Amino acid sequence: MEKKKKLRLKRPFQLILAALLFLLAFSFFQLIKNQFKQENKLVSTQVLNYEDLMLKYARENDIEEYLGLLQAMMMQESGGQGNDPMQSSECEFNTQFEKKPNAISDPEYSIQVGIRYFAKCLEKANVSSLKDEKGIFLALQSYNYGIGYMNYVEQTDKQYTYQNAIDFSEKCKKDYNVSVYGDSKYVYHVLRYYEDTTLVDDWLELYR
């Protein structure tokens, strides 16, 4: 009889302990999940609605710490609107749609391709962290111009400058006989939507 009583007393304790362990595990999972999720008040609701998808593909490419920067890029590219929110249809990793502006008709695919391409830009620019501002400037401008811009930089100044961004655009306009080629102020245009103002302040200090 005494043994049964002890068993009855143990069961509620075991249930409470199991519930506490579950809550602890769930809280830890949520903490890990939200580690890089911080609401950016400078981007639109449409951009924020893609946060989980962006974080998913950022993690796949090991660039989750750049989530805020990716959101700023989407804000500049499309404001989070349309079917190609990362404007990545002309990117080399787009293998499902035509390589022409706004050809992608699947927002998730646009995000997948765009983030993969930006990861490549970061890698080629040898960016090691968010503190590597010159590398980030180079990676951002290359997302807009294409990797060809990095090859041009390697042959000229060896690093991003606002002037070589202008020069590359002018060169491409002549080479391709077009009136517009990319956005020479793309770095600034992205960073104005990035909450850490250090990068945009440094860009303005160096290149305004």
Report the location of each language-model feature:
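GGW-centered surface loops in extracellular recognition modules
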Residues: 64
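Non-catalytic cell-wall polysaccharide-engagement segments
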Residues: 2-48, 53, 61, 98-112, ...
